[in-house]
Amino acid sequence: MTNLSVNVNKIAWLRNARGGHTPNILELSELIIDCGVSGITVHPRPDLRHITPEDVYTLRELTKRKKVEFNIEGNPYAESNKHYPGFQEIIQIAKPDQCTLVPDSLEQITSDHGWD
């Protein structure tokens, strides 16, 4: 059987573009889970363009409570900055069910290639 994990980055991107807390990533992620998906996926980036470290930790608690998979994708070499603890630190704190390594850079709009 194929499992579906929904990436909620664009929900966070829209929230950040608007400022404030709307749309609410936690509420919409819970709705997505209640529709029957097998997991939630996020891709936190050092520039905080969508998912923030706080979102990661909040969504981790939700996925534990709802008993669905939590997948964090990102560049394992992404270092910390003033507002971002670094990808490896996020993974160590959140302890996702799955971690997908993505070779993207800060200059990329979106991930578009694999590892060489």
What is each stretch, according to the model?
Residues Y77-D116:
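Conserved anion-binding
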Residues M1-F70, A78, I93:
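Conserved N-terminal beta1-alpha1 strand-loop-helix module at the mouth
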